[in-house]
Each structure stands twice: as C-alpha cells, then as structure tokens.
C-alpha cells in the first residue's frame, strides 16, 4: 500500500525531536510510525501520521523544514525468515530500499 511520509529535517541538538513531536501532539495528530537517522550535525525524522496536511502545517508553523513523499507499506510475516523472504521479493523485482521501518 502506498502512503505519504513526512520527513522533518532537524539540527542534532537537545530538544529538537521533542519540539517536533510536541507540535504534532498539540494538533492531536497520531504518529503511526517513525524513524530517525542522524549525523553529528543533522538528522531526519521520518513520520507516518494520521493527517499529513495538519502535520505539515503544524511542523512548518514550528519552523521545521519538511518534505512529503510517497512510500510503500508491506506487512512482513511474523515468523523466522519473514523479513528475508520479503526482501527477496524486492530484490527479484529490482526495487532498491533506501531505508525501512520495522517493528
């Protein structure tokens, strides 16, 4: 299934993640999934949320740089080798994964 993801660009300093999450909480936006990637100076908070339009507005109002892009969601079998068998399908189809969420 295809969904829209929000990427929030953050300085890697204390309180920045909390400020972004707080901006969403104040608008009653549910975070369905998140991923954080960082370097020593900057990070990217990637989010799947309940209402992208409101989330983008709230984050921009809180002075964050944000982008929205399409991603796909795949249910992975909850068993040994479940992730591997799913990744094999992507490889067979020539689909490159840039990153992934997992739980």
PLM ranges: what are they?
Residues 1-103:
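A conserved regulatory-domain signal marking ACT and ACT-like small-molecule sensing domains
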């Amino acid at each position: 299934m295809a969904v829209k993801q929000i990427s929030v660009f953050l300085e890697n300093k204390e309180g920045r993640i909390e400020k972004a999450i707080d901006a969403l909480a104040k608008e009653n936006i549910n975070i369905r999934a998140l991923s954080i990637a960082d370097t020593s100076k900057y990070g990217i908070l990637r989010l799947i949320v309940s209402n992208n339009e409101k989330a983008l507005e709230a984050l921009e109002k809180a002075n964050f740089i944000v982008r929205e892009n399409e991603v796909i969601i795949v249910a992975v079998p909850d068993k040994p080798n479940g992730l591997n068998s799913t990744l094999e399908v992507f490889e067979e189809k020539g689909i490159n994964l840039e990153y992934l969420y997992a739980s």
